[in-house]
Regions:
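Carbohydrate-associated surface elements
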Residues: 40, 160, 181
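Aromatic "clamp/platform" in nucleotide-sugar-dependent glycosyltransferases that forms part
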Residues: 290
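Nucleotide-activated donor-binding/catalytic signature segment of Leloir-type glycosyltransferases, i.e.
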Residues: 252-270
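Short alpha-helical donor nucleotide-sugar binding micro-motif in glycosyltransferases
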Residues: 268, 277-282
């Protein structure tokens, strides 16, 4: 068994939080020891030592500012991280990037205490750099590449992402392609109605449900979806927006003329069972992002048998290729959706067939078991090589 010190996020909720929670839970279920290190105790606390107990699997580091995207650590965070790692004595340090400017110090810090360092590199990308958001994300890759080259292994989600990092100088031999995975036994089509399902359905009301679930940020490109929905005749159909983020107040204000029988702003949803129930009830899931990595929300929707429409950015187009969903370009999203949405509304049998193909694709390629099998292999190889 392997003892992993996991550097990740617990809050605010985002894809990185989902990735860390699902991966570490599965590792623990397989008998591995996981110590979760994250930014949690505010820097203005009076604590002089890391929030660490000998029998506590979690370590909290101080921060100045924390958001869905990035955290600014307290000046003493690096010292506290080093002290924690020296006490924990893990076999592996695994960082779920990006977290904070402390990311760039990890290779040197782990080298000082002779610990192998693995990173999962989440930032979204678009190989074609078709917009300003994609160009901004490319800068993130350029900024991180020199540091990533000093990690012992870097986990990426697709061959395309691997090529981008290789062009920036990150050794291909250090990069391991391990796509995201979801638990198909949790994210599954509704088999039998339950209290959670009934409660969610009551809140949503009658009608067919079309869904976006994720961060409400500029790069998620939700506005074209809302514009298209507003201009489409959607009798007995509702668009539900689940999530939170910096663009939410602006978009809510811009589309305040849409009544609740056409558009529902659900807000952030932390409860797993509720998120599963929403996905199960939804007929179609939209992901109109300008840039992506490999969206966990997309995989979760596919696993529940929900028909999916996503842009061809990051690895999402690859996930839905050959009929597992509808792939659109990041160019003129609104125009494409104005054509697609009426078809999906008028042909429920088509959405049902798409949903079935989507779940088949997840079972074939993107289960959590396959993901953890591959991560375990990386851990064991590194642990053995450091022993020798």
């Amino acid at each position: 068994m392997v003892h992993v010190a996991w550097l990740g996020k617990k809050s605010p909720f985002c894809g990185n939080v989902s990735y860390g929670n699902s991966t570490t839970k599965e590792l623990k279920d397989r008998g591995h020891k996981v110590s979760f290190i994250h930014f949690d105790n505010p820097s203005n606390s009076n604590a002089k030592n890391p929030l660490f107990l000998a029998n506590d699997p979690e370590v909290s580091l101080p921060y100045l500012i924390k958001s869905q995207v990035y955290t600014i650590p307290s000046p003493r965070a690096e010292k506290e991280l080093k002290i924690s790692l020296e006490r924990l004595k893990p076999d592996i340090v695994h960082a779920s990037l990006t977290l904070s400017p402390l990311d760039f110090r990890l290779p040197e810090l782990c080298n000082q205490i002779n610990l192998p360092l693995v990173g999962t590199f989440h930032p979204a990308f678009d190989i074609k750099n078709r917009n300003l958001t994609a160009n901004t994300q490319q800068l993130t890759y350029q900024l991180y590449a020199p540091s990533l080259g000093k990690f012992n292994r870097i986990i990426v989600f697709s061959e395309t992402q691997k090529k981008i990092l290789a062009k920036l100088g990150v050794n291909k031999e250090k990069q391991i392609v391990i796509p995201n995975g979801v638990d198909e036994n949790i994210w599954e089509p509704l088999i039998e109605k339950n209290k959670k399902h009934d409660a969610v359905r009551k809140k949503l009301g009658d009608g067919r449900i079309f869904l976006y679930m994720g961060r409400i940020a500029n790069e998620k490109n939700i506005e074209p979806l809302l514009r298209s929905w507003r201009k489409t005749k959607t009798y007995n159909c509702k668009l539900v927006i689940v999530g939170d983020g910096p663009m939410k107040p602006t978009l809510e204000n811009s589309f305040s003329n849409l009544s609740e029988d056409k558009l529902i702003w659900w807000g952030a949803e932390m409860d797993l069972e509720t998120r599963v129930a929403i996905m199960q009830i939804a007929e179609v899931f939209f992901l109109p992002s300008l840039v992506e990595g490999l969206s966990l929300s997309l995989l979760e929707a596919m696993a529940t048998g929900t028909a999916c429409v996503a842009t061809d950015t990051g690895a999402d187009g690859e996930v839905l290729d050959n009929g597992a969903g509808i792939v659109i370009s990041t160019d003129n999203v609104s125009t494409q959706l104005k054509t697609i949405i009426p078809i999906l509304i008028e042909h429920p049998a088509f959405t049902k067939a798409l949903g079935e193909k989507a779940r088949d694709r997840v079972i074939e390629r993107y289960t959590l078991k396959k993901n953890i099998d591959a991560i375990e292999k990386v851990y064991i190889e590194l642990k053995n090589s450091f022993k020798n």
